[in-house]
């Protein structure tokens, strides 16, 4: 009987480890943005956003509220002339609001080769709201802005 209890306990623990917490799921889904950013695949990036997402890119002058606008932003920003690209998030903090909503704030920077030289853009500040819709975590709010220089 005790061995049966141990077996059941291990089975339950194994099942629990299969299901990640909302924080880890949302962070993993958001990492896909950085992976896609390096590919110049605009459609892949847009698929990470909810159809009703609110979007402020670094160069956005107005709030973007449609997938076509988000795609247009990345078509312009990711012109394919960037050479090899690396996108690195850091200092990320996640706040779980519910089982299906997580806010992530942090910084990130991109590095690319241009004319044989490494060029770094950033670090930028970034805040996103991730929402689980069905089985997918999607970006429902995105705001990116340059990090201000410290006061002298």
Regions found by a protein language model. Name each.
Residues 52-55, 60-62, 109-111, 145-149:
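Solvent-exposed loop/turn segments at secondary-structure junctions
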Residues 110-114, 130:
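Beta-strand elements of well-folded, non-transmembrane domains
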Residues 123-150:
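Short beta-strand edge/turn micro-motifs at domain boundaries
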Residues 94-102, 130-136:
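A short, structured loop/turn motif at beta-sheet edges
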Residues 1-7:
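Bacterial N-terminal signal peptides that target proteins for export
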Residues 11-48, 138, 151-152:
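Short, low-complexity N-terminal intrinsically disordered segments enriched in polar/charged residues
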Residues 23-24, 42-100, 119-121:
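A solvent-exposed, acidic/Ser-Thr-rich amphipathic alpha-helical stretch
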Residues 100-110:
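A short hydrophobic beta-strand element
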């Amino acid at each position: 009987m005790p061995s049966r209890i141990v077996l059941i306990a291990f089975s339950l623990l194994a099942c629990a480890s299969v299901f990640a917490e909302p924080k880890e799921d949302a962070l993993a889904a958001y990492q896909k943005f950085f992976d896609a950013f390096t590919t110049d695949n605009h459609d892949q990036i847009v698929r990470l956003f909810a159809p009703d997402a609110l979007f402020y890119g670094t160069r956005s002058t107005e709030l973007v509220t449609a997938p076509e606008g988000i795609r247009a932003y990345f078509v312009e920003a990711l012109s394919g002339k960037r050479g090899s690209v690396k996108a690195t998030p850091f200092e990320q903090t996640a706040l779980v609001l519910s089982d299906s909503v997580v806010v992530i704030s942090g910084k990130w920077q991109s590095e690319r080769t241009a004319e044989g030289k490494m060029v770094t853009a950033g670090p930028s500040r970034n805040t996103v709201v991730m929402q689980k819709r069905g089985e997918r975590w999607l970006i429902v709010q995105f705001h990116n802005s340059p990090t201000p220089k410290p006061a002298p």
